[in-house]
């Protein structure tokens, strides 16, 4: 009886862990996961289209949230490839859009100044809400939740800017 109870308890603990685990195969086979920046990059980003949602918007600020899988590729420097399942919130200040910046007379006359202005501040910020780590087979390695909201700037040349643009396009229909 004690053995049966122990087995039942073990099954109750192991089955939920397996349901939440995500493997590389599962990510690639799910049609909701859209690959962003594949190729020679050390990390491929997959955005779960079904998780994209508008969080908040006002006249100048837009926020969108989504699950992004950061998958380390074989050409990475690390020995063990990993998968991060990251819940992110992007914040975009519309005052930093190209159209808004062009309304400023100094930038409308000299496009090189416009480029410098966009490089200085893309208008996009990012915060990480939670992270779950897995190996390629789907074995859970760690879980970090309830991360305090702390936005960091996303530069134009950062791959996360491309990911953020995709999320905003899906959430709001524009980039």
Spans of features found by a protein language model:
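Sec-dependent N-terminal signal peptides
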Residues: 4-16
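N-terminal secretory signal peptides
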Residues: 21-83
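Detector for glycine-centered tight turns/loop "hinges" at secondary-structure junctions
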Residues: 42, 111, 123-124, 136-138
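A structural signal for short, hydrophobic beta-strand segments that form beta-sheets
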Residues: 46-49, 103-105, 118-121, 126-133
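Mature extracytoplasmic domains of secretory-pathway proteins
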Residues: 56-123
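C-terminal partner/receptor-binding element of secreted or periplasmic proteins
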Residues: 133-175
């Amino acid at each position: 009886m004690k053995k049966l109870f122990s087995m039942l308890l073990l099954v109750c603990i192991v089955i939920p862990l397996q349901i939440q685990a995500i493997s590389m195969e599962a990510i690639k086979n799910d049609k909701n996961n859209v690959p962003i920046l594949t190729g020679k990059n050390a990390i491929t980003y997959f955005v779960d289209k079904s998780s994209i949602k508008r969080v908040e918007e006002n006249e100048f600020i837009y926020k969108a949230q989504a699950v992004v899988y950061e998958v380390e590729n074989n050409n990475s420097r690390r020995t063990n490839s990993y998968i991060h399942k990251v819940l992110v919130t992007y914040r975009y200040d519309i005052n930093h859009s190209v159209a808004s910046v062009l309304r400023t007379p100094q930038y409308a006359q000299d496009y090189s100044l416009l480029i410098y202005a966009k490089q200085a501040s893309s208008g996009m910020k990012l915060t990480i809400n939670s992270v779950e780590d897995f190996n390629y087979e789907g074995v859970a390695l760690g879980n970090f939740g309830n991360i305090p909201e702390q936005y960091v700037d996303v530069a134009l040349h950062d791959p996360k800017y491309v990911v953020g643009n995709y999320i905003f396009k899906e959430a709001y229909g524009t980039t």
